[in-house]
UniProtKB/Swiss-Prot annotation:
It comes from Pongo abelii (Sumatran orangutan). This is Signal recognition particle 14 kDa protein. One of its GO terms (molecular function) is endoplasmic reticulum signal peptide binding. Component of the signal recognition particle (SRP) complex, a ribonucleoprotein complex that mediates the cotranslational targeting of secretory and membrane proteins to the endoplasmic reticulum (ER). SRP9 together with SRP14 and the Alu portion of the SRP RNA, constitutes the elongation arrest domain of SRP. The complex of SRP9 and SRP14 is required for SRP RNA binding. The gene is SRP14. GO terms for biological process: SRP-dependent cotranslational protein targeting to membrane.
Length: 136
């Protein structure tokens, strides 16, 4: 994985979007980063380790090429503006998903059709009971 500066990351991310425009996907992850390069031991925290400031780790991949950058809290506003403009410019090829309302409607119609004979039988039983009590 290649760790890039913020501006280089945005440039490479634009290239990834252009490469995957016709077919393929770009996966982007964002998480808090405290500067550790080694995993946290199971027993607890490492003595003497104090993170200087909060940072964000951004990673992007198309399945073959991986890029990443670390953004400090001081430059996060500037980076987010550039990042949001890049996303707006390159996410024009999104397709609207077919919602699953069609399957819900068919299931609801099937349930109503199954319930209709039962409701008719209940109504007939009620009518017969009413007629029997009226005849007595």
């Amino acid at each position: 994985m290649v760790l890039l500066e913020s501006e280089q990351f945005l440039t490479e991310l634009t290239r990834l979007f252009q490469k995957c425009r016709t077919s393929g996907s770009v996966y982007i992850t964002l998480k808090k980063y405290d500067g550790r390069t080694k995993p946290i031991p199971k027993k607890g925290t490492v003595e003497g380790f104090e993170p200087a400031d909060n940072k964000c780790l951004l990673r992007a991949t198309d399945g073959k090429k991986k890029i990443s950058t670390v953004v400090s809290s001081k430059e996060v506003n500037k980076f987010q503006m550039a990042y949001s403009n890049l996303l707006r410019a390159n996410m024009d090829g999104l397709k609207k998903r077919d919602k699953k309302n069609k399957t819900k409607k068919t299931k609801a119609a099937a349930a109503a059709a199954a319930a209709a004979p039962a409701a008719a039988a209940t109504a007939a039983t009620t009518a017969a009971t009413t007629a029997a009590t009226a005849a007595q």
